[in-house]
Amino acid sequence: SDLCQGCLAHPCMEVCPKKAITWESGRSTIDQEKCIKCGRCATVCPYNAIVKTERPCAAACGMGAIHSDELGRAEIDYSKCVSCGQCLVNCPFGAIADKGQIYQLIQGFNRGDRIYALVAPAFINQFPTLASTGKLKAALKALGFCDVVEVAIGADLCTVDEAHDFLEEVPGKLNFMATSCCPAWSMMAKTAFPDLAKNISMTMTPMVFTARMMKQADPEARMCFIGPCAAKKLEASRRT
């Protein structure tokens, strides 16, 4: 950085194993083509002039799924990605976007499809001082939804089902049981801790419970989940 003081010792040049640092115009310059990002130069610089910068998206990713390609652009490794959405909300440039389905929803309204709004429990606090639960439900119906259903119902069904599984499996067959409510968590556990995958409950998520319940009541209707979790989109796209 511009903090380089042009010291006579040049410790950064001495410790670089790839000779990637040269002396130009009175200060040290790093050749990015040779640099292997080992960090030795930053460690020995007495003026803290060498700073390691990290992409906000990569720093936010707990799975290490984001790296730089040969052109220095951020690239997502989908074999590690769990669709948690942290890179999306932490990118200061809006360069990462999830797949929107607003167009398909509008098409459904225009066709006259019966579409239920399945709202996550978090909706109740989205506009705490501006709109009550009743107003939010009325607004969704005014948009074209035939009815509004709270996914909290599915959460209750999920709890009961998981409780039955727990009583049958623990501690006789399993030493513990992990919840399956969060699709991002389930993917992370199966990817990072494959030996513990068997301990994850096979119970459906609250969203799936609610959607199936409504499908049984109204087979011709379509379901639209509304919630803050990006991983739900990946979950909804699966055929299970």
Where are these regions (language model features)?
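Glycine-rich, histidine-containing beta strand-loop boundary motifs that form or position
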Residues: 16, 25-27, 49, 54, ...
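Glycine-centered loop/turn motif at secondary-structure junctions
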Residues: 20, 49, 65, 95, ...
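Short Gly/charged-rich anion-binding patches and loops
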Residues: 11, 40, 56, 86, ...
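Iron-sulfur-associated redox domains of electron-transfer enzymes in respiratory
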Residues: 98-240
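Residue-level recognition of alpha-helix initiation/capping sites
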Residues: 7, 36, 52, 82, ...
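Conserved Radical SAM active-site core
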Residues: 31-32, 37, 47, 56-57, ...
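Transmembrane alpha-helical segments of multi-pass membrane transport proteins and ion-pumping complexes
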Residues: 6, 10-15, 44, 90, ...
